[in-house]
């Protein structure tokens, strides 16, 4: 894995956090909900850094309908 691993500093502070339970194919709807509905309805904006995901289950070994993924979006 030539050059495929590195170090990244994640921003601290507040994050919007949503937990997705279900197939990976539905994960984009979580981003639509956070960015298109949740943030604007609360007068919040994204902060520095990119949104990221924490996979609480292994997508390769867990059934599709039992996936658990946290989506975290840094807030300004």
Residue ranges, per PLM feature:
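A solvent-exposed interaction/effector surface
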Residues: 1-76
């Amino acid at each position: 894995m030539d050059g495929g691993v590195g170090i990244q500093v994640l921003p601290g502070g507040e994050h919007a956090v949503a937990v997705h339970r279900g197939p990976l194919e539905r994960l984009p709807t979580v981003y639509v909900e956070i960015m298109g509905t949740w943030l604007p309805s609360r007068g919040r904006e994204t902060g520095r850094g990119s949104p990221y995901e924490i996979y609480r289950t292994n997508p390769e070994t867990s059934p599709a309908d039992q996936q658990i993924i946290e989506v975290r979006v840094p807030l300004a």
